[in-house]
Amino acid sequence: MSPGGLNLLYLPPFSIIARFFITALIFLNLEFLFLLYQAFNKEFYLTPSVHVFTLGFMASTMIGALFQMLPVVAGAVIEDPLKKATFVHIGLTLGTLFLVYGLYSFNKVALLGLFFLLISLLYISSLMLYKLLRIKNLRDAPRGFRFALGSFTAGIILATFLVLNLFGFINLNHKYLFDLHMSFMLFGWTATLVASVSFQVIEMFFVTPPYPKFISSYLPKTVFTLLVLKVFLPNFSLIDVFISLIFTIYAFFTIKLLLRRKRKIKDPLISLWYVSMTFLIISCVLFPFRENLFYLFLISFGMFVLSVIMAMMYRIIPFLVWMHLSTKGVPKAPTMFEVIPQKKMWNNFYLHIISIFSLIFLIFKLYFLPPTFFLISSLYFLYNISKGVLVYVKHIKRAQSPSTSNIV
């Protein structure tokens, strides 16, 4: 076990997280291209646009990260991970493409996308849950993964009902299903998983004090319990207020811990965490009023997710490149800070901030400008992460390792 309590004995192949992260960033660029296309055509399709981001970008990133974190952080070993990851990766990618196209054109090809997503996502979420539930005495981070995966599974099932409802196969209350699906996916899955991961990585990577136990131990289970209550009490608005309050407290404590870090050097990733937590707080303020401020809520939550994933990818890829090369005994392995130079991270941070400020152009109905700025930022993001992955490939090939065939 080391560093930071990581179990390196079960380190899965680097290609798993690399393919999920690269795919996620390709989808991120497709999202902004899609928004740009809609802006020039003076149209806007909310549902397909949202799902390019939530499935293509968010889910690809988080599932790829969990393939890495379950065995290393929780000791929950997934046997033959490369084959399982390939199956999930193909299903998620094809499912997202078919679903988004079907929703955009109101074509029943969306059902094919739903099929691919169901078999891949329900398979991996149930497998990961099973592996985590078998382990006793888990630390707070992997214990939180359980509740996040439970919410993810619930969100997938609710999404199935929504698609079937949309195409007339069943007749259920769409507003009720939609609100539950959104709540489970955004707060039960995404925000809870981000929080759970941060319980591990904030202290380890940024040398901060640990999170208070009342947050790290109780946040995931409390949020999950509130969401289950929401299923039976959909009109009890205080549930949304409590969920918002919990994540607001979490965000403030995250900022507080980062301000108390031992290394007081400027770091673009810490700046991204500050931006992310700021938008999480804004999202929490808007969540109880989302019916009247829905687009503001979605944008703020999207900025929270985009900022935190940028911060995590820029730390995870260099760390894993260094870790894998070091454990393989590759000579002259680069340090974490050589894999992706910090100057490039700062450049991407500034592009990201400019993109966020460009959202003000929406007020003046200049709808093409924000996706243009975000596309430039996300292309640079993809370039940097790809270069980081290629550092690993180059060093492995140079060392002529027998495991080269497992890299790509």
Swiss-Prot record:
Signal peptide: none
UniProt keyword Transmembrane present: yes
GO-annotated cellular components: plasma membrane
Major localization listed first in the record, in broad terms: membrane
Domain of life: Bacteria
Membrane topology: Multi-pass membrane protein
Listed name of the protein: Uncharacterized protein aq_917
Native source species: Aquifex aeolicus (strain VF5)
